[in-house]
Amino acid sequence: VQDMPVQEVAQLKEKIQQVDHVESVLWYDSVADLSIPMELLPDKLYNEFNTDDATMLAVFFDSATSEDVTMDAIREIRSIAGKQCFVSGMSALVTDLKDLCEQEEPIYVALAVACACAAMMLLLDGWLVPFVFLASIGMAIVYNLGSNFFLGEISYITKALSAVLQLAVTMDYSIFLWHSYNEQRELYSDNKEAMAVAISKTLTSVLGSSITTIAGFISLCFMSFTLGRDLGIVMAKGVLLGVLGCVTVLPSLILVLDKPLQKTKHRSLIPDMGKFANGVIKLFPAFLILFLALIYPAYNGYAKANSEVYYDMGQCLPEDINYVVSIRKLQEEFGIASTHMVLVDADTPSKSVRDMVSEMEKVEGVKYALGMESLVGCRIPDEAIPDFAREKLESGNWKLMLINSEYKVASDAVGRQVEDLNAILKRYDPQGMLIGEAPCMKDMIDTTGHDFQ
């Protein structure tokens, strides 16, 4: 929160606490009454949560990071807070990413349709043919999206990608049927008979390729990273429905529109490929040698590209989107790039917790670790801490600590930092947990790394 008087910040905090699924909000008045100057806080606590013109609030939800209700809460907090406030964190990232996908999905689907339509109008032999193809595939896409109802839910990433992927993967089947039908029309006087033969030949041609495509998508279901299963099931369904549409819906459309389709035919812009084919046959040893020679640099390029894969989804977002602006502001004002949370057994002795915090603060890149012990400075006795604050940092089973880091989420540096912090934590509490954006992304990196191998 920037450039806001203390009393207004307190009012803002109260409004945020009223948002559905906000479990609690921690700020200065969670520790002491506003009549007590903030400077009486322990120096460590004051300096890390305040700058000359900004202060931080910690918001906790009673729902999961990516739940719809959490994202609704993020949107409501932003609307309440206004332009003086910047909301960061994993939930804010997921909210912005989902909103961006939903906002841009109609745009890139429309672009895909327009590009496919333009290419087919020029490279196929009919002006009306592309629209018939798109109508048939559009029906298959709607059937596929509708049948996702039986899955219960799908990832917004799968939803954003599936329509365009299905269009790209299944378009060839329609082209096969069209060419086969035109060939059979020259052999049969009855269009229906010609279409029946064309369907038979098309099925023979596309069955093998579609089965291998479906098998490829189903293989994604065996990934440890369950987004693969989500995408694999949806796309396998999409290919199957695309094949069924190609031999049921599309033939019906072609037969109904046969006259206008034939009247709007034109010469294809694709030149005769006979000379090229003859040249390939004559020079096939040279092509074989060329491709063998390219294997080594291609493998090196593959290895280099896979070693530089990035996992920070924030890098995918525009610079002016809320999350990116907020995380940049947090870095500029407080030097914080990511936040971890530590849960330790509530029965862990206070001395052990203090020793653990001391060790964690020595880990490279850790800006500070903050827990109940940090709130108890020499000027604030333990009994002066409000029960509300104690309840939020200590429950019946756990003690909560916040660790702020100078390292960005999903970076190699924060990965090493998470490993070091986990090692320290397990020495003091084998059942303790390190959670947050960076630990989550590290788990995802480890999981997908295993899948990629």
Question: What does each model-identified segment do?
Answer:
Residues V1-V94, V309, G314-Q453:
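Structured non-transmembrane domains adjacent to transmembrane bundles in polytopic membrane proteins
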